[in-house]
Amino acid sequence: MKTYLGIDVGSISYKFVLIDEKNQVLFWLYKRTEGNPILAIQNGFKELRKFIENHNAEIEIAGIATTGSGRYLAGVIAGADLIKNEITAHAKAISNFVPGAQTVIEIGGQDSKIIILENGVAVDFAMNLICSAGCGAFLDAQSFRLRIPVEKFGELAIKSKEPTTIGSRCSVFAESDMIHKQQIGHKIEDIVAGLCEGLARNYLGGVGRGKKINPPIVFLGGVSENLGMRKAFEKALEQKIIVPPYNTVMGALGAAILIKEMAPLKTKFRGFEISKKDIKCASFQCRGCPNQCEVIEAKIDGKIVARWGDRCAKWSNLNPV
């Protein structure tokens, strides 16, 4: 049975999605990297192997694609046949699972993006990689400070009757504003709802500035699990927000569909034994020109298997020694 694997490695979490030749999801995984993306990817392969052994030993991985900010690292570890940016991967998944969608709001752990689609093709996009305000890591920090499990954050927000106003342009000022609102007696649910509304405004005024946000509007990423953020976007846009199945793993799902469509004759997959290998990454600065690129070097069991990060390909084109 031929299957195709998509892997999305981000700043906070990693995702695996395995599909069959009809784009049916057979296995999916969404977990935190916990600051160690190499070990996270290896653990992902351990879980996938266990799933295959327990469900269908005849599953064959016919192709692997990686995406996300850690796509090159994941590609080297897995032996990817295709490495694609997350904009392309998300657009591909949405065109298959939410046909007709025109706007994609995606908020992850430390970045956020907007994708404008026409006939299933990304025609415009913007990303915020500078400030974490409104992203998953910021919401995690606030839920911890308020002693509310992040899973309950959204449920609490939608109970609010009078959301308070929270300044949300900057994560530092937003936190200070929340503390002030607590001190003057605002209810926790009103503060949480106010934070969600402020973050939605911040997103629309930042990442979404100047974009034509037309329905159907799809909300993806870990933050899309937050009911309060869904409600805040619906209030700000006065439009229904669609949160589709597999909303947290759409990047990996799109990568899997892309590699299925590419249909490599022979996969470069290194095999499940990669989960037991000694994998290390290091970097050095190339001083060959004024760019002074930071080159990343990956080793598996002491052998250099890849280099990347150089603009001119001086190092990445070298055969591993």
Residue ranges and their predicted role:
Residues E34-I38, N119-E162, C170, E261, ...:
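Glycine-rich phosphate-binding loop plus the immediately following alpha-helix
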Residues A174-R209:
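Adenine-nucleotide phosphate-binding core of ATP-dependent small-molecule kinases
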Residues K113, E261-V321:
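Acidic, glycine/GT-rich loop-and beta-edge segments that sit at the periphery of enzyme/chaperone cores
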Residues Y4-K46, D124-F125, L129-I130, R311-C312:
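Short glycine-rich, Thr/Ser-proximal phosphate-binding strand/loop in the N-terminal lobe
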